[in-house]
């Protein structure tokens, strides 16, 4: 089974506001960078989009190590998701799960892979995380340019 390391990050200027996501996939000496942005979004949605797009890029089942600076993503997928599903996509206090559309998508995408989820401190000099952060900020700029072009 192919091994892939993923570094993901999201960025948001205003929350909600302009947002971007970035992800770096590394496997066997090959690297792939992906990024994108949205005009009106939240930081958590962009963090989720970064990992979703990483998994969408995988063409076959892989052993994946995901590094994220988002405790929301890391804890959500590792600790909270099973409970949300068991409760019909409700939190422990019976409120609807925020961003359930993205959580459902991520849940579907990871099922064919062996995945380990790792939290890293953001903006602490971790090279993979710093690259993902730079890509997420590129995504913000693309969203900004798209708005300006449409104005």
From Swiss-Prot:
GO cellular component: cytoplasm
E.C. designation(s): 3.1.26.4
Amino-acid positions noted as binding Mg(2+) 2 in the UniProt annotation, renumbered to this chain: 9, 133
GO biological process: DNA replication, removal of RNA primer
Cofactors (names): Mg(2+)
Function: Endonuclease that specifically degrades the RNA of RNA-DNA hybrids.
Subunit structure: Monomer.
HAMAP family xref list: RNase_H (MF_00042)
Protein name, as recorded: Ribonuclease H
Annotated source species: Ralstonia nicotianae (strain ATCC BAA-1114 / GMI1000)
